[in-house]
Amino acid sequence: MNIVIVQLGSLALITLAGPIIIVLLFLKQGNL
């Protein structure tokens, strides 16, 4: 059960952090 919870948690983090990371990278490229 713990493995399933960890997998779901990691998927949720990737789903939420994905767009944020893309935006941060875009802003960094824009600043450069």
Curated annotation (Swiss-Prot):
GO terms for biological process: photosynthesis. Signal peptide: none annotated. GO terms for cellular component: chloroplast thylakoid membrane; photosystem II. The keyword Transmembrane applies. It is found in: Plastid, Chloroplast thylakoid membrane. Its main location: plastid. InterPro entries: PSII_Ycf12_core-subunit. It is a single-pass membrane protein. The chain crosses the membrane at residues 3-23. Keywords: Chloroplast, Membrane, Photosynthesis, Photosystem II, Plastid, Thylakoid, Transmembrane, Transmembrane helix. Belongs to the Psb30/Ycf12 family. A core subunit of photosystem II (PSII), probably helps stabilize the reaction center. PSII is composed of 1 copy each of membrane proteins PsbA, PsbB, PsbC, PsbD, PsbE, PsbF, PsbH, PsbI, PsbJ, PsbK, PsbL, PsbM, PsbT, PsbY, PsbZ, Psb30/Ycf12, peripheral proteins of the oxygen-evolving complex and a large number of cofactors. It forms dimeric complexes. This is Photosystem II reaction center protein Psb30. It comes from Euglena viridis.
